[in-house]
């Protein structure tokens, strides 16, 4: 059956959008990369036949453009697109956690963000999400503007932490004045997030206030 005859909700792209990539089979993901079928075969049929011919994704990854182009309905352009996607997956796999930045001290955290944040003209509130080895998994800008406890919603911060499977996190924000002395709001936000982290089990390790080539650690100041 041609893809246009499939119910809308059963088409790979629509299922990808609705349920996410993990809900699709290998041949459905390959079909998305191949994009189109022929007059006689749907792209899903071509995808399934391609995987069957080579015996699975691993063998497809090792195939040449010429070998893949021999599959009816594929051609060089589709072969290149598929091999490029598989190569990206291979490269991502080889990027081990050993290459991630490690934060062991407040200085490590400040060095990670200083050059990006010291000259910002507005306050940026950023979270650094870490794994169990204190390696940075993700840097996320929570909001831009004056820091206020009513604006910083723990829900948004911990939602991102769960998404990244973080074990802990560090909050960072800048003072455009260049003076990193923490304000009352800075301290209140820090203590609120620290208490939430204790309940949820994702620890706030520190809150760094960035100035011009200097910073303050609220942990070192005794607020955590």
Swiss-Prot record:
Pfam family, one: UPF0758_N
The keyword Acetylation appears for this protein: no
SUPFAM superfamilies: JAB1/MPN domain, RuvA domain 2-like
CDD domains per UniProt: MPN_DUF2466
Chain ranges for the short sequence motif JAMM motif as given in the UniProt record: 173-186
Protein name: UPF0758 protein BPUM_2444
Binding annotation for Zn(2+): 173, 175, 186
Natural source organism: Bacillus pumilus (strain SAFR-032)
Record keywords, A-Z: Hydrolase, Metal-binding, Metalloprotease, Protease, Zinc
GO molecular-function term, one example from the UniProt record: metal ion binding
Taxon lineage: Bacteria, Bacillati, Bacillota, Bacilli, Bacillales
């Amino acid at each position: 059956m041609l893809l246009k005859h499939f119910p809308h909700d059963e088409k790979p792209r629509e299922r990808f959008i609705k349920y996410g990539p993990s809900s699709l089979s290998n041949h459905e993901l390959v079909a998305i990369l191949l994009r189109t079928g022929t007059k006689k075969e749907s792209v899903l049929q071509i995808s399934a036949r391609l995987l069957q011919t080579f015996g699975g994704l691993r063998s497809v990854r090792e195939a040449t453009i010429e070998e893949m182009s021999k599959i009816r309905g594929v051609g060089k352009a589709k072969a290149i697109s598929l091999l490029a996607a598989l190569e990206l997956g291979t490269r991502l796999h080889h990027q081990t956690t050993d290459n991630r930045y490690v934060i062991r001290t407040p200085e490590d955290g400040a060095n990670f963000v200083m050059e990006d944040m010291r000259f910002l003209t507005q306050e940026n509130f950023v979270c650094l999400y870490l794994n169990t080895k204190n390696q940075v998994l993700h840097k996320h800008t929570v909001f831009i503007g004056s820091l206020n406890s009513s604006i910083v919603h723990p829900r948004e911060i911990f939602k991102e932490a769960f998404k990244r499977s973080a074990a802990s996190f560090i909050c960072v924000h800048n003072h455009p004045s260049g003076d990193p002395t923490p304000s009352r709001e800075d301290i209140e936000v820090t203590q609120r997030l620290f208490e939430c982290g204790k309940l949820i089990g994702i620890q706030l390790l520190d809150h760094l206030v960035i100035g011009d080539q200097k910073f303050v650690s609220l942990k070192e100041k005794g607020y955590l």
